[in-house]
Amino acid sequence: MLGLLLTSLANDPANSWLSYAAWTSPSGKPISFVNTSWVVPNDPAQSYGSNAPGWWYGIQTSNGDGALIQPILAYGYQGSFYSIFNACFDWTDGSWHTSPEKYTVQPGDKLTSSVTYNKGDNSCTPQPALKTRTRDC
């Protein structure tokens, strides 16, 4: 694990991420689907600035350029609460776009999100799906 971590830190595409992981398909075929489930954590002690937490995963080309498609769970993006939304950062021109759909979520909510590859038009569709959004009491 340490070797992977050192390699990952050495190739940090943004020179600022705390950590990240990379995977390359041994067959060279594109990743067709990525899914994750997460539980919204408690509100942070400090809510803004560099202390505001955010979590995401993303899909991009094997060259590490072009569009980085990513569902994001972030605190403080729209106010003093958590939101989940989709975003796209384009490494080629530095542009940043977010989806018009942004959902407010609460600590304890269980969320799922996914990114699906569409072979027909060589695109990806992210979903910050709230279909499993529930709260444990």
Segments from the language model and where they lie:
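Exposed, interaction-prone regions of secreted/extracellular proteins
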Residues: 6-137
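Classical eukaryotic N-terminal signal peptides for Sec-dependent ER targeting/secretion
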Residues: 1-2
